[in-house]
Amino acid sequence: MDCCKKKRVKKVAKRKSEKVIHLDPDALRYLRFRIGGKYMAERHMFLKKDPSKENSIIVSNIPAFVGEGVVLAIIDQFASFEVEESFVQRSNTADNSLSQGQLTMSITFDKPEAVIQTLALCQDVGPFTITDFLEDPEFPSVLKDSTTLYRKLFPSEEQIQEMADTYVERYDTEQTEARKEAKRKYSEPDEDGWITVTKAKKAAKSVKLKKEDVPLIGGLNNKKKKVDLAYYTFQIKKNRQEKAQELLKKFEEDRKRITQLKQARNFKPI
C-alpha cells in the first residue's frame, strides 16, 4: 500500500488532557497506539523536537500503511494546533521505499508552543486505535503479498503460452521487416549513384543420351516385360497407403520440430 496516498480519515471526539508542562526540549517522547481489529498489541511512535526548526517535531516508527493523515489526526486529539507543513522524510528499508517499513515524518506547527504541549502530553494519552481514524481500513497481509510474489515469479501455463506466442510473433515480424529492408537497400543507389546488381546463376544444360548409350535404361534388353495387372493394381494401392503413412509421419515430426524450435528461441519468460 502506498503510504503517500490520501486516506479517508474519520473525525474522532477529542480527549481532554490537562497537565503542567515541565519538559526537557531534547527528551525523546513516545505516543501509544494500536492497529485495531485482531491487532491489539500496544505500539509506540517516538516524538522529539526538531533541533533545526523551533516550531517542528519529528515523529518516527510510523508503520508505512498508517499514513500521514492518521498521525496528524491522532496528535490533534490532545494538541489542537494549526499545522503549517507535514511530510514524510524517510523509511528504514534498505531501498528507502516509503510504502514499506517504518517511516519518519516532520510536522511543523504555526506556533512554537505547540511543540512543547505536544511533547508534554503525548505520553499521558492513548493508546489510540488506528482503525478509529480510518473509514475503510486496509492493512498489508503476508499471505496476500506472498501470493502476489508467487504469481509474479511463477506465471501460469496460459500466461507462459501467451508470452511465447507474443515473442515468436514479434520475432517473425522483425525478421520479415529486416528482409524487406535489406531488399530495399539493394534497389537504392549508393552515395555515388550506383545500384548493386546481382547476376543469377545459369541453370545447367541438360544432356541428351540415346537409349543405346545407357544400358540401365534398356539398351541391353529391349524385350517388354509382361506385367500381371492384378498384382500391379494391388501394388499401386499398397504403395499409395505406405506413402500416405510416411507423409502423415513426416507431418507429425515437422509439427513437433516446429514446436521445439519455438520453445528454444532465446525465450526468457521471467
From Swiss-Prot:
Coiled coil listed as a keyword: yes
A single GO BP: ribosomal small subunit assembly
Keyword match Cell division: no
One Pfam family recorded for the sequence: RRP7
Any one GO cellular component localisation term in the record: UTP-C complex
Keywords (A to Z) from UniProt: Coiled coil
InterPro entries in UniProt: RRP7, RRP7_C
CDD domains according to UniProt: RRP7_Rrp7A (cd12951)
Coiled coil: 233-268
Family according to the record: Belongs to the RRP7 family.
Protein name: Ribosomal RNA-processing protein 7 homolog
